[in-house]
Amino acid sequence: MKIERVDLIPISIPYKHAEVSSRVSRGGVTDVVVRVVADDGRIGWGECCSGADTLSIVAAAQAMTPFLIGRDPRDVQSIKRDVFKKGLWDYRVQTGNFTWAGLDMALLDLAGQEAGLPLWRLLGGRGSTEPVSYFCYLARDTSEGLRRQCAEAVAAGYEHFYIKVGIDEAEDERMIADVRAAIGPERKIRIDANEAWPLPVAAKLIARWDAAFDLDFVEAPVRARPVKVMAQLRQRVSVPICANEGLGSETETLEMITGDAADVLCFSSYWVGGMQSFMTLSRTAELAGNKVCKHTHGEFGIAAVAHQHALLALGDGSRGHQQTASVMEDDILQSDIPIRTQPLWGEIDAPGLGITVDADKLDHYHKLFLADGQFLPWAATVE
């Protein structure tokens, strides 16, 4: 089996509501869908994360494509080595990682199809018999709106509730209080400040809000670099600290682990350049006593499925992984993935990623991108 063609299709799908944090304000997700066609007619699917600029990811993927053509898609690691070393993407690591992760998914999809096995089996088989658990992503809202969001999520079975903070202290506190009142004392609350606070403010707010509302963990409360800032905060508070920003490469992620700066690492194959790197660093984090929470920048079903395979293989007992499937207006897969409507997701039986892309939806949301451009991270277009 050899790779004949690589197609790159940027698409935009709106959120049900705007995503608003201390860093971003956007109305939907724009990513680059990857379609890798093999000489036997098989198709592998992937999804590149856009980050700041979609067209730069398209350009990066185009630059990487010559290293794929004519190669066996099962030779993932040697292709990656050529892309980053001969293609010099090791000098543009974050863009390279965001791009390569999507190509990597497509190659692994083809490898699984050729083997007749779901990807999680190629990644080592089930790490646990438990289904993978995902969180409820709450929108910043009025008290009434948050009560409604929480009631629907509790009815659907969610145990982990996540909300963005770091914008307005009083408003943040009101929303956390609303969530705790709505979900009861047993369910978990996680907050994400996206590096909004200086160290003294972070220490004060975390202590106060944990005493009042019992926080499960706090994500990115302070800047991730230098690592000692997070490490100092971790010594000053009793709440587990989660790192996300600052995990932009294999080296940075390893530094966060060895620097004892966080209790939880929130990242994905996008951050570290491919599924094997994500698996390796997740295992390394586990050996160091950390938990791993799968991160999402906002994703379509392709990326969600790919990472579900990885989480099935990891099986480290972490719960409440990140997802945006439940807050997207639509998807491009023919069948809804389970986490569109519920928090739990079990085995995937079909070979490779085990997905079928809806050609009409793919075309529709590609045309939406062509007409309106990407959902910019600083310009929400829906309420």
What are these regions (language model features)?
Residues 1-44, 49, 326-332, 381-383:
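Structured beta-strand/loop patches that form or line metal/cofactor-binding pockets in enzymes
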Residues 3, 34, 41, 64, ...:
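Conserved, mostly hydrophobic/aromatic
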Residues 5, 37-114:
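Metal- or metallocofactor-binding catalytic centers and their adjacent structured scaffolds
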Residues 64, 207, 214, 225-242, ...:
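Shared catalytic-loop signature of beta/alpha-barrel
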Residues 100, 138, 164-168, 194-195, ...:
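Glycine- and other small-residue-rich loops at beta-strand/loop junctions that grip anionic moieties
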Residues 108-142, 357, 361:
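Catalytic pocket of metal/acid-base enzymes, prominently hydrolases
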Residues 124-237:
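Metal-dependent enolase-superfamily TIM-barrel catalytic cores that perform enediolate-based chemistry
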Residues 353-383:
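Extended hydrophobic packing segments that form well-structured cores
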